[in-house]
């Protein structure tokens, strides 16, 4: 890891505490932003640099293309994830490899300790907030897992503010 991104004390008790790598804090926290963008979780590159959707990571390159197509800059979004540490799929010779989807217990812990307080602090806890969920885990987490992904793709959903605090 090239950045001091050790897990804070509030991560203790998380089912992924001993498995997860690094700790990736939100980008543009404390800055005025137009929308929040929430992904599944950091990958290896993001964990190494402590930056969500790092521009040199596959997901970061995709996000850069999306934002460019929408004529938006990274600075216009609060960029974060539903889990804030990298969840490697396996370990080979002690080295983490790949990515795995977070469990519901990991999502619940990270949301209650990190994401939900962040959204409230940044003003994204009301029904007029604009939040973009990227991927199935983030979408399921924010919509309480109701329905299939096809129901949500390319659409806007109203999420009760009580589900965001």
Which residue stretches match the model-derived regions?
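A polyanion-binding, active-site-adjacent surface
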Residues: 1-165
